[in-house]
Amino acid sequence: MLQPTQTSWVILAGGQASRMGGKDKGLIELNQKPLIEHVIERLSPQTPSILINANRNQDAYRAFGFVFSDQFKDFPGPMGGIHAGLVHAETDWVGFVPCDSPQINTDLVERFCNAVKEDTDILVAHDGDHQQPVFTLYHKRVLPKLTAFLERGDRKIILLYKECNTSYVDFSDSPNCFVNLNTPEELAQFGQLES
């Protein structure tokens, strides 16, 4: 069985945050702490290796850990961060979570590790209704396929899943894990609920 210590986890903070008015979501405060700090607090007891993918405000993010940017400069969305994470992480298995989901399960890493089989390439969280493609675990052997995928301009993650041995991890008992805060209104509402 894959152990959590054999994985690295990347917090994806490289997006443009257009729905948040262009403000860097990971650095926006929720209850007096940046969103990324909430994610780190949930993730750090689960894994010794946390990295941050950010394409701006890198000095601010360095306060929280090792930071790297996308290698594809045309912002191919989370796929650019996943690609860069596979390049920079030192482990064969690399997990990914978004910077704007402050309620990540405290057993998220363990669930992913328990679901790995010998031939698994990609694991994706599933909430019972939908796949959650930014809550995912990749084996580094996917990197050549992902590089080719991005170089030809593909952006639909489902196409990559079809090229790889992809399985899903059941989180239907934990829908709050996937609450992400995309707008100032969602942030304000969540802050009131969580205060």
Swiss-Prot record:
Cofactor: Mg(2+)
Gene name, Swiss-Prot/TrEMBL: mobA
Keywords: Cytoplasm, GTP-binding, Magnesium, Metal-binding, Molybdenum cofactor biosynthesis, Nucleotide-binding, Transferase
Sites where the protein binds GTP: 12-14, 25, 53, 70, 100
Any one Gene Ontology cellular component term annotated for this protein: cytoplasm
Top-level taxon of origin: Bacteria
Organism field: Vibrio campbellii (strain ATCC BAA-1116)
A single GO BP: bis(molybdopterin guanine dinucleotide)molybdenum biosynthetic process
GO molecular function, one term: molybdenum cofactor guanylyltransferase activity
Catalytic activity of the protein: Mo-molybdopterin + GTP + H(+) = Mo-molybdopterin guanine dinucleotide + diphosphate
Signal peptide: none
Pfam families, sorted: NTP_transf_3
Subunit structure: Monomer.
Name of the featured protein: Molybdenum cofactor guanylyltransferase
Disulfide topology: none
